[in-house]
Amino acid sequence: MPHVDTKAGFVRENFNKIANKYDRFNDWNSFLLHRIWKNRLVREIEGNLSDRLHVMDLCCGTGDISVRLGNSPRVDHITCVDFSENMLEIAKTRLKKQIEKGRVRFEIGDATELKNFQDFQFDAVSIGFGLRNVDDLSKAIREILRILKPGGLFLNLDVGKVKNPWIRWIADFYFFKIVPILGYILWGGKNEMFDYLPVSSLAYPNQENLKSILEKLGFQEVRYKNFVFGNAVLHIAKKPL
């Protein structure tokens, strides 16, 4: 990460650069499976909370999860937060209908400092493939816990760790060797962001460790669902009543 002082700064700078290619990149590198996983995230919200929900889509990127939340009859209002201005601009174009209905708010912000939001403000907070990019994981989780209402849910979809050594070898080869090449093809040349995306998984906690971190910081009833042998994982955590 040569050009900026922090991981968050690097990520913001480079997500702004690749914003208009990001959705296609996700389709390519996951064989469209990320769409199914995001649908599952929204179904978890619908199945575990009541109606007229106020949901924050944190690290919302281009609004992939936000669009799905907007289509849910259970969700009354969506707050989209990301520190990439270019990503947010794409999200705004995808959520035009929800903007016209007054159902969505956009905010440039950092997951570790949600100072524009009150305590106990949201019924649920979602993150899709963003938590591993924050500078301070624990600080971000504490902020999420703070803004959730008692009984509210935090749903985090991100990369996971595969236990089976043979499948892990195949997954690592694909993730570290093939995925950057897909990015270069899409970009039309080398871009350091497509090298960073696989590398970012190395320091990110595995499924059980993230579960333990969430519990230690105050969440309860923490569970997770593995996808594709654990290559991706959805954690669901509840704020105590």
Question: Model features per residue range: what roles?
Answer:
Residues 1-23, 186:
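N-terminal, positively charged/glycine-rich alpha-helical extensions of SAM-dependent methyltransferases
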Residues 112-125:
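A short acidic, Gly/Pro-enriched loop at the edge of an enzyme's catalytic core
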Residues 123-137:
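A short SAM/SAH-binding and catalytic strip from SAM-dependent methyltransferases
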Residues 157-213, 217, 223:
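C-terminal alpha-helical "lid/dimerization" subdomain adjacent to the S-adenosyl-L-methionine
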Residues 138-153:
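A short glycine-rich, Lys/Arg-flanked "PGG" loop and its adjoining helix->strand segment in the class I
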Residues 31-53, 68:
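Conserved alpha-helix/loop element of class I SAM-dependent methyltransferases that forms part
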Residues 217-241:
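Core SAM-dependent methyltransferase catalytic element
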Residues 54-114:
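Class I SAM-dependent methyltransferase SAM/SAH-binding core
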